[in-house]
Structure formats: C-alpha cells, structure tokens
Amino acid sequence: MPAANAQSRGSYWITTFGCQMNKADSERMAGILESMGYRAANAELEADLVLYNTCTIRDNAEQKVYSYLGRQAQRKRLDPNLTLIVAGCVAQQEGESLLRRVPELDLVMGPQHANRLEVLLNRVDSGQQVVATEDHHILEDITTARRDSSICGWVNVIYGCNERCTYCVVPSVRGKEQSRLPEAIRLEMEGLAAQGYKEITLLGQNIDAYGRDLPGITPEGRRQHTLTDLLHQVHDVSGIKRIRFATSHPRYFTERLIDACADLPKLCEHFHIPFQSGDNDVLRAMARGYTVERYRRIIDRIRERMPDASLSADVIVAFPGETDLQYQRTLDLIEEIGFDQVNTAAYSPRPNTPAATWDNQLPEEVKVIRLQTINALVERCARERNARYAGRTEEVLAEGINPKDPSQLMGRTRTNRLTFFQAAGPDGHQHNPGDLVNVRIDAVRSFSLSGTPLPCVEQR
C-alpha cells in the first residue's frame, strides 16, 4: 500500500520476463512505486507508467521485449505523459543504445539499480532521460516488496555471478556476486512470516556460491558464510513451514549442503541443479567447471540421503561444435538420472560472449530437431517419474484457486509437483489458500497431479 503521506501519482504496470530473480526484482520495484503513491493498473493500456523488466539470456526473449516496446512507444507518441521504463538485463546490456532505438523511453536501468527506482524516477520527473547501468553496490533492505503471493515468497540472498560460462551473458548484465548478510536475510524472512507467509524460496544466480564474498573463516579453516550455514541460521524462523532454494551450480553443491537438506525438516526435497550437457568436452567448452562424473556423484548423494527427492535441471542442445555423439550423451544422462523436469533450450548466441564468435555454429535445422527430440524424452521421463505418486498421500501447500476451475485449489508438494484438488473435501471441509493439505493422488500427468483432499494438516 502507498505510504500515508504519498500523493496519488496514477497507475503502473510491470511486465516481467525471465527468471525468478527478475520476478523478485519486479516485486521490489512494485513496492517502491506504491510507496511513491502509484497504484496497480487493471490493464497495461490503462497504466500511466509502464515498466518492462527484461531478460536477455536468449534472443527470443529479447526480441519479445522490443515487440512490446514498439507498441508502447507508439502509444507514448500520442500520450507524452506516459512514463516508459526498461529495467533488467536487456537494459544493462544495451544501455544508451536503447534510447537510440526507442527514443520514447524515459528510463533505462540495469538490475543492480532496482532499489534506486524512486531516485531515478525523480530525475525523470525533472525532465531528464535517464540511463543507469553503471556498477552499483546493491543497497540492503531499503524497500518493501509488493508480493504477488501472500503464501509463498522469494528472498534474494546473493546477487550477480562470478562464473564465466562461454555462452552466458548474465555476469556482464548482473555484475559480480554480492551476498547479503545472514542477519538481513533472517530479518526479511521473519517479516514475511509475520505477514502469514508459509514458504520461502531463497534466490541466487548461483545460490550455493553464497558467502564467497563475505569475510570470515571458521576455526576449522572453512568459510564462515556458506549456503549450508545460512540454512541452519534461518531454519527456525517461526511460522515458515517450508524452505526452498534456487538455482544451484554443481561446482559448489557440497556433501555438507546435501546433509543439511536431509537433516533440516523445513527444507523441501526438490533440487534444481543445471547440468547443461552430458558430455565432458562440451562442458569444458562451456567453461562449466565440473564433469559429468562430478554431477552424477551429487545426484547419487542426494538420492542416498533423500530417496524420494525430485530433481530438475537446465540443458542446452546444439552448442557450437556439439556432435551427434555428444548430443546422444546428453540424452543418455537424462534417461539415466530420471529427472522430474528439465528446462531445455537450443543454443542462442548472445552478444559479448566467447561462444558467439566461434565458427562451429550448428545450423538452425539441427537445433530444431535436437530440441524436439530432447523435449519428447523430457516429457516421457517426467511422466514416468510422476507415476510413482499415484495412490500416495502428499502434503500440498495450497497456493491459490485453479484459474480453469474455481472449485479447485492448486499448490505444490514438498517435491515441487503442481497438484490440483477440490477445495471442498469429501467430508465437506472447505480448504483455503495457505492451508497445508493431505491430498491422495488420483491422477498423474507429465507435469502435474490431481487428487482428493483428506482431513486438513494445518489451516492458515
């Protein structure tokens, strides 16, 4: 809600492209706008301020942004009072050139500047056309986010990325790693718990690299601040029932972290660990810093400690120079491990990345065929993995109403399976968003489950 002394400044609309980090940034920027007196618009074309929080990890996401911008630029030529903003990774990558391409823009701001939105808008109000893409230390706890959910919340714990994967633009647009202090993270979680939140997902580009930039060494000679230590420090926040984290890098996913996830009861048994390729030579070309054998050991240890854990990953097919045999090894690894879900993408050359300059790019038709083939395998593996839930009773956190059937609630199991069930149980009990519900699984599909609610585990 706007601050008590904030004057109404009209309405705003935010469209978010890309990852969970962007979604969390958008929530913070929405909070800033509402503290300034803006209110959420009912539709984009009704908004007095339009903000696109952008993604540049693949070319198709970037082109979609320009399509949206074209429509709003045309609108602004008819209504000069419209405030038009591009934030996020496209803004960081393109900077001043965005103003040349879309001169109707008022503000171009990289992801490191999300917390500075009010300061930057004040400059816009004074008549400036503003570009903010310089390196900037991310300020701690200066905004209150406007959350899109009142049940599940995101908490950023580390910003940026120090890796140098040859295909990836993230380090150049999100900057170097900046870890938040554990005390600040815990304080934010306590605030969310006080508002009634039940589940928190801790976020970072490489979340298991958390703390590498923070000072301190333990008497045993290891870093004082790690993701494992952070999980222990926030686990007892009263009111929070579930904790997740994403996204992990295999290089930093330690046995100590796995043991903490197995031992701490609030930690959900779901792990998103990208592997990108099932071939070691391709991994070396990508500069990923681990081998397929290392990845297998991580998965083996997870399943040793948490046999029913669900696993998801990211993979890139048709990387420059990828042979048929190397591609087949990726297919074989997916089948061998049996992922619950894999996010797939054909390689997309990105500006200012080494791989984009290589002369062994694969033809588009090869990319299409390899992507179609791997997607069919991923769906089959997901369906086979989901089959194990049939007839079981799973704890589901009801997150909201099924938009396709208002009589149903939808939520996720601890293993992150999307689950639908009737809000009214067979005994007539009415379940509500925020309830933890025991659901008997009656039907399974590739990427979701359906079931019957049993007596409520816990009501909100």
UniProtKB/Swiss-Prot annotation:
CDD domains: Radical_SAM. Its main location: cytoplasm. The keyword tRNA processing applies. Residues 10-126 form the MTTase N-terminal domain. It is an enzyme of class 2 (transferase). Catalyzes the methylthiolation of N6-(dimethylallyl)adenosine (i(6)A), leading to the formation of 2-methylthio-N6-(dimethylallyl)adenosine (ms(2)i(6)A) at position 37 in tRNAs that read codons beginning with uridine. Monomer. This is tRNA-2-methylthio-N(6)-dimethylallyladenosine synthase. It comes from Parasynechococcus marenigrum (strain WH8102). The gene is miaB.
